[in-house]
Amino acid sequence: MLDPNLLRNELDAVAEKLARRGFTLDVEKIRQQEERRKVLQVETESLQAERNSRSKSIGAAKARGEDIEPLRQEVNQLGEKLEAAKAELDKLQADIRDYALTLPNLPHDSVPNGKDDSENVEVFRWGEPKTYDFELKDHVTLGELTDGLDFPSAVKITGSRFVVMKGQIARLHRAIAQFMLNLHTEQHGYQEMYVPYLVNHATLYGTGQLPKFSGDLFHTKPLEEESESQYALIPTAEVPVTNMVRDVILEEDELPLRMTAHTPCFRSEAGSYGRDTRGLIRMHQFDKVELVQIVHPEKSMDALEELTGHAEKVLQLLNLPYRKVVLCTGDMGFGARKTYDLEVWVPAQNTYREISSCSNCWDFQARRMQARFRAKGDKKTQLVHTLNGSGLAVGRTLVAIMENYQTADGRIEIPEVLRPYMNGLEYIG
């Protein structure tokens, strides 16, 4: 959520920055609402003061033996006007907030302008894609040869965009997640979290999935009216982990917080019809190891570089070629101020595919969550900055390993760093 003071005092500058994202801010609507809000604010304060004054007059008139009925009627009339003005002000403020909740974050000055992912900018490349002297197989074919990926059973059990993993492929999938968690907790300073996979709507508002992206979620009940019994499956562990600091005031010396969690993620993939229908690239349910940092505002840009580096380390230790791109304004997520994507080399597709997205959300989520900290010697509180990133998507890492480590006879070599998690196994198949 954007700072209301920016919308009041720097509206044209905000509109200009949002235009970089291809978002048209209704400037006239905001100006009219703000003018009306000021009028109603003055009116309610004036009516409240007048009503208080008249109420005091009743006691004085009564002490003098005067007829107080006219004064009492006047106080009642002022009370009715006050309630009406308050009701209008409350509704207007709710309308202002509802509109503010639909506004995306402002892009950082360092983010390149662009309309879509074709205008993202590559900033770094690591590793060289292997050359093969045999015909490459994709991960689906390799999964069939090793009897490790069973899509027909998943379709029977649930539907499309699900998978059943079996045997050593299932074990490799588990090993990947364990390796990532151990790396992030033992070397990168993250605290491992186990979190609910179902969250309430206040949590989804906090990290920005609601109200705008309800259609991307799996809800336990239709989203008609909010109640405590309505939940949604998490689209990413970012949602429950970041909300750990909702309505919390931290002390400055508690920052930064670094948290990681391995969870399944559930996404409806609305708008993705016909895209990546084969294999594990785009699923309704997939596993991810998430990285979250809660930091001092002055350190969030450095934290973005650090967090992205932690995700990159996974790829480097697995010896998987990748590239790092900074997303342009037209491709950034709703709550992000700046985002790096890591794209891993997928040989069968002869291209790089996203495997991690690392974002600095600035104070956008913190304002929604009222996540704050108190600086040393200061009574006032400030909003923290929040960051999140995939460290990494487990299923896509499995795809990359299967395809990059395939052999001519259809086996899959186990990356050396994963062999301790596989009881020393060197090959699958």
Curated annotation (Swiss-Prot):
UniProt subcellular location: Cytoplasm
Main subcellular localisation: cytoplasm
EC number: 6.1.1.11
Pathway terms, separated by semicolons: Aminoacyl-tRNA biosynthesis; selenocysteinyl-tRNA(Sec) biosynthesis; L-seryl-tRNA(Sec) from L-serine and tRNA(Sec): step 1/1
Residue ranges, annotated region (Disordered): 45-65
Gene Ontology MF annotations: ATP binding; serine-tRNA ligase activity
Catalytic activity line of the entry: tRNA(Ser) + L-serine + ATP = L-seryl-tRNA(Ser) + AMP + diphosphate + H(+); tRNA(Sec) + L-serine + ATP = L-seryl-tRNA(Sec) + AMP + diphosphate + H(+)
BP GO terms, sorted: selenocysteine biosynthetic process; seryl-tRNA aminoacylation
Residues the entry annotates as binding L-serine: T236, A237, E238, E290, S390
Keyword annotations from UniProtKB, A to Z: Aminoacyl-tRNA synthetase, ATP-binding, Cytoplasm, Ligase, Nucleotide-binding, Protein biosynthesis
Sites where the protein binds ATP: R267, S268, E269, E354, I355, S356, S357
The keyword Thylakoid is annotated on this UniProt entry: no
PROSITE patterns: AA_TRNA_LIGASE_II
Domain notes: Consists of two distinct domains, a catalytic core and a N-terminal extension that is involved in tRNA binding.
PANTHER family: SERINE--TRNA LIGASE (PTHR43697:SF1), SERYL-TRNA SYNTHETASE (PTHR43697)
Function description: Catalyzes the attachment of serine to tRNA(Ser). Is also able to aminoacylate tRNA(Sec) with serine, to form the misacylated tRNA L-seryl-tRNA(Sec), which will be further converted into selenocysteinyl-tRNA(Sec).
Family, per entry: Belongs to the class-II aminoacyl-tRNA synthetase family. Type-1 seryl-tRNA synthetase subfamily.
Subunit-level organization: Homodimer. The tRNA molecule binds across the dimer.
HAMAP family: Ser_tRNA_synth_type1 (MF_00176)
Protein name: Serine--tRNA ligase
Primary gene name: serS
